[in-house]
Amino acid sequence: MISELQQKITVLKDLLKTNKADAILIGSDQNRFWLTNFPSSAGWLIITSNKAKLFIDGRYYEAARNFINPIVEVELFVSFKQVKAFCESNGINHLLIEGDYLTFNYQDWIQAICKQYTVINAQEIRRVKLPSEIQAIEKAVDITRKVAVKLKRFIKPKMTELFISQWITNELVKQGGAKNSFDPIVATGKNGANPHHKPTKTIVKEGDFITCDFGTIYNGYCSDITRTFLVGKKPKSAKLLSAYKKVEEANLAGINAVNTTLTGSQVDKVCRDIIENSEFKDFFVHSTGHGVGIDIHEMPNVSQSYNKLLCENGVVTIEPGIYIPNLGGIRIEDMVLVKKEKSVWLSKSIPRAF
């Protein structure tokens, strides 16, 4: 049986063939972890058609050498001269580099070690999730589900957004998460009109809607869900109740639309059309969703501009929203595992407002 590491290396080798390149240089923490399953904050990984080598500094060297599969050769990193020497000794003249992670600070150095380089969107290599990645994401979602179940009962009038946000953070760790996958968004009342509102000392009131967007990390992989709950039993705003129903309609339609025959933009349109053909047409102000994995936002996107087909075993969010200035907002976000026909609704058991 081919190991997951070998499958990932094959993905990179195919990328080399497609771009007629000699090697790919990986400097991002995310892609180093993706390939080696070894977390580190620095290092350079080079993959050729027949070699894989990791240059890593003294903080990680011994641990990496003992942990990482011997398919990947590990060398103590001292200076970039080692990487240049490796390229020269292996006849590497054309490098692929991670345009979505590397900064201009490295441009001169890369030009010095290689005659030619091609910038790629390196997140694309992680679009298809392997079984261990899916399992980690499923576990992260389940931890988030447990917190959401408690959260719905926990929220009470007179609590502040900040207090609720801190409770979410603590509870995610209690339930087995490593840490937040991002700072929780908690927005009550009028604050809900800001999609990325930062929690404040605003007090939760009876009859308000409160949007809670949060997730955790498990074994290096993220979850990301949003629920807009009602505080109490009767909403103060009939318009926001109507908005909730419309967002939920769009959310469910988007979840059901996800499969490998549609592009990200086509799924976005399914959700967007429902809202734009309603009284709330001016209040959906962001994309429908995004990929989730090692990064909280990664490929593929579910947006008006993403015209690639969704790939089997990709993981995406479906998160339509309505945001009405000076009134409030509604967002419902779920995670979906893409399949050829009927995709898997990973967050189906996470409670909703009604």
Swiss-Prot record:
Cellular component aspect of the GO annotation: cytosol
What cofactor requirement does the entry state?
Mn(2+)
Q: Which domain of life is it from?
A: Bacteria
Question: Where is Mn(2+) 2 annotated to bind?
Answer: D213, D224, E333
Keywords of the record, alphabetical order, are: Aminopeptidase, Hydrolase, Manganese, Metal-binding, Metalloprotease, Protease
GO MF terms, alphabetically ordered: aminopeptidase activity; metal ion binding; metallopeptidase activity
Q: Which Gene3D superfamilies match?
A: Creatinase/methionine aminopeptidase superfamily (3.90.230.10), Creatinase/prolidase N-terminal domain (3.40.350.10)
- List the CDD domains: APP-like
Biological process terms in GO annotation: proteolysis
Q: Which PANTHER family match?
A: AMINOPEPTIDASE, XAA-PRO AMINOPEPTIDASE P-RELATED
Spell out the protein name for this chain.
Putative Xaa-Pro aminopeptidase
Protein species of origin: Mycoplasma genitalium (strain ATCC 33530 / DSM 19775 / NCTC 10195 / G37)
Taxonomic classification: Bacteria, Bacillati, Mycoplasmatota, Mycoplasmoidales, Mycoplasmoidaceae
